[in-house]
């Protein structure tokens, strides 16, 4: 912490939903202006911000940069759409490509970048699923489910550097609505509240 340096990256006052690339070279953020939102990217070594996706009638709900920093993955609500969709966008600008629908958290990548994990809320019965899909959005599958008294929150999960576990926030209605972190074994789908053996 002695060598930590804090720098202001934007000064407009309308930036939200930011993410940094795994190699620390890029920062992506959302700008909201006039009821529309756009996606911007910046090289940390420079002071210039580049518009990656122009303003549109969307609400970005989470942004993540891929492991190799070539793509930005952003979940977004279009207009009055009830469910968020996941888009893959070339990091330095290009046309967004919809790769998934019905996603309720930012994604988190596996260490090799071949897959990502995300949360999908379930309305009835109340709950949420922790989902895994390939980097192109194909092959989605349920890694773990939560229903009833302990439910995954719509927050970004975190894939462990060794690839064996995923951590996800959850709320426990058995413990007066307290929240915590649960780990999920990628191979078996077994869940365990963090700190318990």
Describe the predicted segments one by one.
Residues 1-197:
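Acidic, proline/glycine-rich low-complexity intrinsically disordered segments
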């Amino acid at each position: 912490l002695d060598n930590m340096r804090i720098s202001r990256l934007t000064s407009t006052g309308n930036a939200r939903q930011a993410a940094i690339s795994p190699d620390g070279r890029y920062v992506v953020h959302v700008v909201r202006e006039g009821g529309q939102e756009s996606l911007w990217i910046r090289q940390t070594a420079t002071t210039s911000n580049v518009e990656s996706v122009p303003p549109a009638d969307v609400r970005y709900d989470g942004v993540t940069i891929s492991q190799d920093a070539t793509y930005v993955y952003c979940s977004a609500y279009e207009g009055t759409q009830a469910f968020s969709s996941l888009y893959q966008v070339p990091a330095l600008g290009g046309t967004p490509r919809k790769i998934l629908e019905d996603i309720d958290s930012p994604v988190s990548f596996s260490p090799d970048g071949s897959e990502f994990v995300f949360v999908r809320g379930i309305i009835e019965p109340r709950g949420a699923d922790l989902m895994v899909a390939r980097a192109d959005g194909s092959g989605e599958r349920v890694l773990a489910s939560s229903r009833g008294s302990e439910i995954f929150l719509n927050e970004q999960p975190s894939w462990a550097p060794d690839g064996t576990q995923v951590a996800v926030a959850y709320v426990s209605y058995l413990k007066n609505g307290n929240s915590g972190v649960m780990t999920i074994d990628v191979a078996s789908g077994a869940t365990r509240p963090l700190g318990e053996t």
